[in-house]
Amino acid sequence: MESTVAHAFHRFALAILGLALPVALVAYGGNGDSRKAAPLAPKAAALGRSMPETPTGDVLTISSPAFADGAPIPEQYTCKGANIAPPLTWSAPFGGALVVDDPDAPREPYVHWIVIGIAPGAGSTADGETPGGGISLPNSSGQPAYTGPCPPAGTGTHHYRFTLYHLPAVPPLAGLAGTQAARVIAQAATMQARLIGTYEG
């Protein structure tokens, strides 16, 4: 009789211990730490909207197969040649705008080309082409097109900046041309990449 009672008591004690142990583990985090565990961050789907992934290669780049950065621009892309835009290669994950100017011009930077609305992604152009999706604005000559380097004789080496800008939104540019439009674009931009070519007057 005593052994039966003892056996029943033993089973009862084990049952109580089995219930108490999970409670203790919850109270102390399962590892002796009484601090509460940080809640898990909700997934994007739980927020009722999908989160876009960060684009790969999200850095602006611009280059040209016709000349290296800091090297002379071939004559065919100047006023002494065919006066056409050089071929360009770029990466603009969010789209952008292109400004080509000459900061060494006598009075103020001379803007040779402005292109807005360049399509997002990587792209390239052949000789004389405008970047995909782009619209040319009037340059310092008042022409909505590319005009090549044509520095005055005897003014030395001029540096031509091919600057690719990221614009979160296209700023108001109606009625603007040349340096005015270029300044507005530069002020509205959040990122830029630059290629420089030279030409001697």
UniProtKB/Swiss-Prot annotation:
One of this protein's Pfam families, by short name? PBP
* GO CC annotations, alphabetized: extracellular region
Origin: domain of life:
Bacteria
Coiled-coil spans in chain: none
- What ranges does the record give for the region Disordered, renumbered to this chain? 125-146
- Spell out the InterPro entries in the cross-references: PEBP, PEBP-like_sf, YbhB_YbcL/LppC-like
Instruction: Name the family the entry cites.
Output: Belongs to the UPF0098 family.
Record protein name field: UPF0098 protein Rv1910c
Source organism: Mycobacterium tuberculosis (strain ATCC 25618 / H37Rv)
